[in-house]
Amino acid sequence: MKKIIGFILLLTISFNSFSQANEEDINALSIFSEYVKAKNYDAAFQPWMELRQRSPKFNSAIYVYGERILKHKIKNSTAEEKENFINDLLKLWEEKRENFPSKTPLGDILAKSAQLQYDYK
């Protein structure tokens, strides 16, 4: 009987913690997506980066909007920062390929990577 009660208690706690984490992810996605829709990419960067690091498989919008955010950062940054953002964009495309392979053809990623490296060599 104690094992059953303990098991039920453990399940309840784990479901509760999972739903809280999921709510945080939903809120972060909502926050940065609204900033991106308003083209306020600088404000969107921090919540986007937190969600990308915490839950990379949560939603493909992390990668779609992330590409816009990083392209904005590349255009509006110094030479030092630009190189870091370019490398981050290349990494973002690889992460998208790993986490959402059905939505990311390899040819598209390779073509985008080559074009980006050519444009900013």
Task: Please state what every model-predicted region is.
Residues 18-87, 91, 102-108:
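N-terminal leader/linker segments that initiate helical-solenoid repeat arrays
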